[in-house]
């Protein structure tokens, strides 16, 4: 074997490394081997001496091995195939209660298939025993629980599920746990304050903000066949353990979270880090936000002085100079309201436009964030504005300025809000009582009633069917004898069909008064006889005193004689009506108008009852 070396070319000022190649000739095939050779040269002085150091390293290649950048594609394919296989096996193992509706199967396929939610469970709440009935049974028929990978996954799953329900079942889902942008920004501010406070206290707050933003629980009412869907992150699902709540009594032991004590919660971490240090607690109290008002008493007197003079520029300067916490702003608005109340009580003419703009200008987001204190205050202020100028601040303005505003800000309307609107409708004066003006008022009421759909009172009854609300609604349908809405009779029939024997005295009196106002005596007697109890049902509890007063105040001799001669008053004795002194006086006044004073009938009704 002959060996030939290709020597490098020697030149001056060369500072690079030269790579010599060695060629080996054999009788067989020719192979090329490379040796990495590093050569360094020095040209200082006259005598050029070079120092050469060689470091050789052989690189071996395996022709059959696939490079790493080609193996990525294969690994991704294997991973995707594994996910598909797991998905198919999960669908096979998906257990849905028997005799369940087809909608549950479609929703389950969407959650586990397209949305990729894990740990899918369905609880059938229809077959609960009577001994274990709770609030959970009243929610729906099926409870679905599944796990998402993150909070974004929860939110995206809710959006896709809502879109699916609208397309397939024409239903819009109701969700709890979905934070909008305003609530999310508020939560971030609270977390920032908590983080700053923790730094001042020497505590670590790295886990608090991160953990709170990484956990979520969405409870969705599909409004389809009583199906509820709970989408949770894994940690939140372990903490809440909803399976134990929804499971039957004989299966609750299967879902008991035995290792729940090992899962550290945020409050637990903070409690451990504080080490129950009393000094840290005192420092926290010293540095926490003060909740008392720091307004100057002289400022209140000056504000009242400017408001009584209706100098709104001076009042604005005082309010802006002393602006502070949410509690302080609420107290300032209360002071403005009390001043307006005094002026309206004195029947002074006030500039309603300026008073309204003053209240709106200082109703900031900090103030609205206290709904329990702000909205009752705004309602009372709106009633005062309507009392001061019903033409400017009418029922239409109240609908937009209060009801729609409160509803759009996510607050729940209450019974007092609807009553305030109906009272404003009745107080609003028109130039003439015409049918078209009555129709305009009715349109405002219809728009308001649409906002109160589904709202319940404290007695689990609808707000619309409240006794006072019904009375005001009937009064708003009648202006005088000639002007009335055609829907009055339909409303009365609907009230009778809805309540039946459970009609209250207030509802009956309101119906009688409105029928007497339009002088429809036939309908009035028809209503009165329709609610007459039979003799075997016991004592008659109808409002006899109000009925006789309505008839007597009509002044119609024909109607009065018809009531007396047809024997309507005899039912007082037949049904054992409790004759009070007020009822005795009403009977005497009615018989006196009919010309039967001191008659045998009066003695039979009044004196005979007193003797018993």
UniProtKB/Swiss-Prot annotation:
Localisation: Mitochondrion inner membrane
Coiled coil keyword on record: no
SUPFAM superfamilies documented for this protein: Nucleotidyltransferase
Gene Ontology cellular-component terms listed: mitochondrial inner membrane
The organelle targeting sequence, given as a residue range: 1-14
Main location: mitochondrion
Keywords linked to the UniProt accession: Membrane, Mitochondrion, Mitochondrion inner membrane, Transit peptide
Mode of membrane association: Peripheral membrane protein
InterPro entries found in the cross-reference section: Atp25, ATP25_mRNA_stabil_dom, NT_sf
Biological processes annotated in GO: mitochondrial gene expression; mRNA stabilization
Annotated function: mRNA stabilization factor specific for the 0.95 kb OLI1 mRNA. Also involved in OLI1 ring formation.
Family per record: Belongs to the ATP25 family.
The protein's name in its UniProt record: ATPase synthesis protein 25, mitochondrial
Taxonomic lineage: Eukaryota, Fungi, Dikarya, Ascomycota, Saccharomycotina
